[in-house]
A protein has these predicted regions:
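Membrane-anchoring hydrophobic helices of lipid-metabolizing enzymes
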Residues: 1-38, 71-76, 82-83, 228
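Short, flexible loop segments at the rims of nucleotide/cofactor-binding pockets, characterized by
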Residues: 9-17, 63, 82-88, 127-129, ...
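Short acidic/polar alpha-helix capping motifs at helix-coil junctions
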Residues: 14, 38-40, 58-61, 102-105, ...
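A conditional alpha-helix N-cap/helix-loop micro-motif detector
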Residues: 15-22, 41, 67, 88-89, ...
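Conserved beta-strand termini and adjacent loop/short-helix elements that scaffold enzyme active sites
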Residues: 20-22, 61-63, 88, 167-169, ...
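Well-ordered alpha-helical segments embedded in enzymatic catalytic cores
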Residues: 24, 43-46, 94
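Non-catalytic C-terminal accessory region of glycerolipid acyltransferases
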Residues: 26-30, 53, 80, 92-233
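Catalytic core of membrane glycerolipid acyltransferases/transacylases, capturing the structured
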Residues: 30-89, 116-126
């Protein structure tokens, strides 16, 4: 599917990734800044479809790959339909640029993979019955900048074809904590996986490390490690 995107037309991408409640979601978002809190479910690279008809900055956040060739290829794919891209360790720059210019923006964040050690914004949550570490940037960016948060419920129709619906997790104004926003994200992703387990990318080795090991290493390098909750709020 990703290889097909090298030559796929915008019309074909919209045919393969049909967003059923786009008009309703656009009405809710209006001119607000917002976060697309995605997961490795279905063909997540197809989220580039959003940039076709929405011409404000849609910033896809990524982790640079170890292979320079693959990294260039994936950046090309993500930019083809108008998406901007920003490495996780340099995300603050484009965010502040858009905030200063008062230009609307969307951030595409995928938080269901293991955070890297260079990312201090980590949070433990119970996920699929196990203590699991998540990148906590969804909650922190949402609260710091008053950004709405949506996730995407994806269903496979046939090979390489999906339909999806945006689900609002946070309206940008509700008086809840960063952690509660993350709880909603984790719960939504788990529900989607339990409903359609075959669509999730299980190869990310989510439970390679245990909380005790992370805490020990975090202490050794002087980072503050979040505690593992007994259960999500």
């Amino acid at each position: 599917d990703v290889v097909d995107m090298t030559s796929m037309s915008p019309r074909e991408l919209k045919r393969r990734m049909r967003v059923e409640n786009m008009e309703q979601t656009d009405s809710e978002i209006g001119s607000s800044n917002w976060i697309a809190a995605l997961a490795h479910i279905g063909e997540w690279e197809y989220f580039s479809v959003y940039s076709i008809d929405h011409h404000y900055p849609n910033i896809g956040v990524y982790h640079p790959l170890s292979s320079k060739v693959m990294n260039r290829f994936m950046l090309y794919i993500r930019r083809r339909f108008g998406m901007e891209v920003a490495a996780m360790n340099s995300l603050a720059r484009p965010v502040m640029k858009n905030l200063k210019s008062r230009q609307q923006m969307a951030l595409g964040l995928i938080a269901d993979q293991r955070p890297r050690w260079v990312e201090s914004d980590r949070i433990w949550r119970t996920f699929l019955g196990q203590p699991t570490l998540f990148f906590g940037g969804i909650g922190s960016y949402a609260k710091k900048f008053g950004m709405m948060v949506y996730t995407l419920d994806i269903e496979k129709i046939k090979p390489s074809h999906f339909r999806c619906n945006f689900i609002q997790l946070y309206d940008g104004r509700e008086d809840i904590s960063e952690q509660e926003i993350m709880d909603r994200y984790v719960a939504a992703v788990e529900q989607m996986i339990r409903r359609r387990p075959e669509l999730w990318l299980w190869s990310h080795r989510r439970w390679k490390h245990k909380p005790e090991a992370y805490a020990a290493i975090a202490g050794a390098v002087g980072q503050k490690e979040s505690k593992t909750p007994e259960k999500n709020a």
